[in-house]
């Protein structure tokens, strides 16, 4: 699946982007609280990325409750956080080499939903290695989320990351599938489990 043979310098840029992203994700999540502004959190995260030496790979996404993913506050957005389930999705690039992550912040009083997604991510990461099929990763995600009494969101998937490309093959499902693509050494992927208490 690797379109480009990544050399050591390119791997280092992916790693640097990931390190910046991990720090910004955690710091931005701490800013998500009832009454805080969606736009201010997004703008703060994007500026923090730049302070640390990266660039935003895409506008910060702040999605609420059943929205699940891909909502971005507009320039005039005055929305504030309430007692919500918040998905904060952030990307960083260093010279076009991307890292992409999300974190769920529970302001709703239902922490089990966020815990199910986090546990599914950890289980999936334990599965990833060269030669594993994406369907196997999906099966681990589904089994973990099911174990919490929730359902995986099946119309959203993880994905590959390329040079200046946010979504590349392979797709990484959030459920078991019979057909999958075998991961190769050098593939860079974002694994994105989503759990729901709906269908």
Report residues per predicted region:
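Active-site neighborhoods and metal-handling regions in enzymes and metal-associated proteins
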Residues: 1-199
């Amino acid at each position: 699946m690797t379109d480009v043979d990544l050399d050591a310098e390119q791997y280092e840029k992916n790693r640097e982007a990931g390190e910046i992203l991990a720090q910004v994700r955690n710091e931005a999540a701490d800013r998500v609280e009832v009454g805080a502004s969606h736009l201010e959190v997004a703008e703060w995260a994007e500026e923090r990325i730049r302070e640390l030496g990266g660039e935003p790979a895409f506008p910060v996404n702040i999605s609420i409750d059943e929205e699940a993913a891909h909502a971005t506050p507009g320039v005039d957005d005055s929305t504030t956080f309430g007692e919500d389930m918040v998905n904060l999705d952030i990307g960083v690039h260093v010279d076009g080499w991307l890292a992409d992550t999300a974190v769920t912040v529970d302001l709703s009083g239902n922490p089990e939903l966020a815990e199910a997604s986090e546990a599914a991510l950890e289980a999936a990461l334990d599965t990833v290695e060269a030669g594993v099929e994406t369907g196997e990763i999906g099966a681990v995600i589904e089994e973990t989320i099911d174990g919490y009494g929730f359902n995986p969101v099946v119309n959203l998937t993880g994905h590959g990351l390329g040079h200046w490309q946010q979504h590349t093959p392979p797709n990484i499902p959030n459920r078991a599938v019979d057909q999958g693509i075998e991961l190769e050494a050098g593939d860079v992927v974002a694994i994105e489990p989503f759990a729901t208490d709906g269908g």
